[in-house]
Amino acid sequence: MLKIYNTLARAKQTFSPIIPGKVSMYVCGMTVYDYCHLGHARVMVVFDMVNRWLRSSGYEVTYVRNITDIDDKIIARANENGETINALTDRFIAAMNEDAARLGVWRPDLEPRATDYIHEMIAMIVALIEKHHAYAADNGDVYYAVSSFASYGKLSGKSLEDLRAGERVEVDAHKRDPMDFVLWKAAKPGEPSWDSPWGPGRPGWHIECSAMGARHLGPHFDIHGGGQDLQFPHHENEIAQSEGAHGCTFVNYWMHNGFIRVDDEKMSKSLGNFFTIREVLEKYDAEVVRFFILRAHYRSPLNYSSHHLDDAKQALTRLYNTLRGRELPQLDIDWRQPEAERFKQALDDDFNTPEAFAVLFELASEANRTGSAVQAALLKALAGQLGLLQRDPDEFLKGEAVAGLSPDEIERLIAERLAARKCKNFAEADRIRDALTAQGIILEDTPQGTSWRRS
């Protein structure tokens, strides 16, 4: 039975969908003004894993991940680049989809773009004003009145008094309360705007997700996910907006993945340790990055370093070596089989991927010890639940290096080494082996010939 850690309840809870057999899930996606970074990669991969496991468990899933395509940062970047907002956002949406595909992430069922839902956002703001949860200021902005929502702070576990005392909030004379947040921003010269009952303007960030979630999943749905950094204020504000407008529970299960740290420091541009997905994929195979992300529990902090990526590469190489050169039988997973049952128990326990990985490595050890093709096939099938180990082993082990020798060049050198050995020129053969080793190429001489892989 699946259990999920619910941020709202601060506990693991047995998952019980609103409609038996069906799951509605919304995940906050990217603001598309730049290339996706490692934090985005973690959100993509973690909730892809959740999506895969829910489907494997027999649920019919509707997975929505939004795209924020209007925002202060987007406007600033478009102006800085001298390009239109549409050109900027289209370019980075395409780049985001390329990055996600390389990481083995399945496309969500729906990817709504905020600018296509302005009508729904305006309608929700109108409802909030009618229900006295929001007010129009004299400057054309519309604000949510947080004091009107009695349970504001329930997701973050903070009272309004604590928030007022502890949060640094920009002073705005148009607000009735410093904690009130904007639902609609009055138009500024040179910025895109839409007509509304309060004059031309554009939506605030928080209302976008509330409106898109309700449009596609209804006012009450099963799972809402995102990075831990969104818990407050974004998700807190979503609850206030959605429950204020619709008068019912917004989401049953709130899931938040942990932060990315770089060499045990917070990842940030100011510290100079900020990496895009593309920068990381210049150095590491995309499956290694996916493996690295999933090896940690999704709620734990994830520490990025070259040491940890190298370790992930070695671990994944070990698993692929188990599959290499074997004729694997077609296998439908029997979840009553001991290793499969333990794997399922791990993922049913709040998606405990570290425990699931432990099962994979035990299977690899057993397959290597016994030579069992059935054990190796089960290893591949279970890893497939996580989007791993589905390539031809040689494709991974001999895969294109980010830099250095190509497979054709390696094969040529191996042939030269073989010729040198036949001529008993062992010094030349050793020189070629050493040169390949220096390039990270490991040779394995067998009676059937010489095979190779990247270290």
UniProtKB/Swiss-Prot annotation:
GO cellular component entries: cytosol
GO molecular function: ATP binding; cysteine-tRNA ligase activity; zinc ion binding
EC category: ligase
Subcellular location: Cytoplasm
Coiled coil location: none
Binding site for Zn(2+): C28, C209, H234, E238
SUPFAM superfamilies: Anticodon-binding domain of a subclass of class I aminoacyl-tRNA synthetases (SSF47323), Nucleotidylyl transferase (SSF52374)
Sequence motif 'HIGH' region, location on chain: 30-40
Signal peptide positions on this chain: none
Cofactor remark: Binds 1 zinc ion per subunit.
EC nos: 6.1.1.16
Binding site residues for ATP: K269
Catalytic activity: tRNA(Cys) + L-cysteine + ATP = L-cysteinyl-tRNA(Cys) + AMP + diphosphate
InterPro entries: Cys-tRNA-ligase, Cys-tRNA-synt_Ia_DALR, Cys-tRNA/MSH_ligase, CysS_C, Rossmann-like_a/b/a_fold, tRNA-synt_1_cat_dom, tRNAsynth_Ia_anticodon-bd
Record family assignment: Belongs to the class-I aminoacyl-tRNA synthetase family.
Assembly: Monomer.
Protein's recorded name: Cysteine--tRNA ligase
Species annotation: Methylobacillus flagellatus (strain ATCC 51484 / DSM 6875 / VKM B-1610 / KT)
